[in-house]
Design a protein with these regions (language model features):
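Acidic, polar-rich N-terminal leader regions of halophilic archaeal proteins
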Residues: 1-294
């Protein structure tokens, strides 16, 4: 607001022109705005990392909302009775190119792959006759966990949890793939996606490569990522000769979250894993799959 001239005697104080003061204040506010927005939006996100849900209707609403926002991967277990309530959201996710792994629990023994309720809802569908928790993870970042009683009964004191935390979601995915998925029975597997295609979700890459291999059409891949031994950037180009996975039968992975490619390159075979890979040669960030025309 003022300019202080303390290098002269006596010290003088001069008021700055109002237009100049306003311009400086406006400039300072504009400079502060991004930092303030980030700070307070971060606090808001942290406050919303966990939400307690007390009603079946809200659980279904949260599932639909998360499915609508899915960009790369969905893992869902839901009862056969509730499946029709989220069928459209699941089908939309599949149409967007999202990998959808679905377990239908509390399913009738005569449920088959041609049932209209299952049409277009997932890349892989498994069923389990027993009741199990409703569990959803989306993009390994957010999801919902609900006990069976909350969806079965209108009056119960059981509660569900919705979460948005990148540290927790991979643990839930690991539990889904390690506990629920193996216990269920494979019912339907979608056809391979058209090529060429690019995936940032590595499990989707592995699924598509597996389906191509089993159809006698081994694909060619270009992998962008890093070498796991020295963290240096890596680019791997070659033909997929093997996959290790637990999504479709017969499975051949050694532990539940192991999903990898074995790529034959000009310099020999290279193993490729997804985010957090440590037993493979390369951790992939992006994979392009193409027909092998050689």
């Amino acid at each position: 607001f003022v300019e202080v001239n303390d290098h002269v005697v006596p010290t003088t104080i001069r008021a700055n022109p109002p237009d100049e003061v306003i311009d400086r204040l406006r400039s300072d506010v504009d400079a502060m705005r991004p930092g303030l927005a980030e700070r307070y939006s971060r606090v808001e996100r942290q406050a919303e990392q966990f939400e307690v849900i007390k009603s079946r209707a809200t659980v279904i609403k949260r599932i639909r909302s998360l499915l609508a926002d899915a960009e790369s991967e969905v893992a869902l277990s839901i009862t056969a009775k509730q499946l029709p309530e989220v069928k459209e959201a699941l089908a939309d996710a599949v149409d967007r190119g999202v990998l959808v792994l679905l377990v239908v629990s509390d399913a009738a023994a005569d449920l088959d792959a041609d049932d209209p309720a299952l049409e277009g809802v997932a890349n892989v569908v498994r069923t389990w006759s027993e009741a199990m928790p409703t569990l959803l993870t989306v993009d390994s970042a957010a999801g919902v966990v609900a006990p069976p009683e909350l969806l079965r009964r209108s009056t119960t004191d059981r509660q569900a949890i919705a979460f948005a935390q990148e540290q927790l979601a991979p643990v839930i995915v690991g539990s889904f793939l390690g506990n629920y998925w193996p216990a269920a029975t494979e019912l339907a597997v979608a056809d391979p996606a058209p090529l060429p295609a690019e995936y940032t979700d590595f499990r989707h890459t592995v699924l598509q490569a597996t389906l191509r291999l089993r159809a006698g059409d081994p694909p060619r891949v270009t992998v962008a990522g890093r070498w796991t031994d020295d963290d240096e950037p890596a680019e791997v180009v070659g033909r997929v000769v093997e996959t290790r996975q637990g999504m479709v039968e017969p499975t051949n992975n050694e532990f539940p979250v192991e999903h990898s490619l074995v790529v034959e390159t000009d310099d020999g075979e290279v193993t490729v894993g997804g985010q957090g890979a440590f037993v493979e040669d390369v951790e992939a960030d992006l994979v392009r799959i193409e027909p092998d025309e050689e």
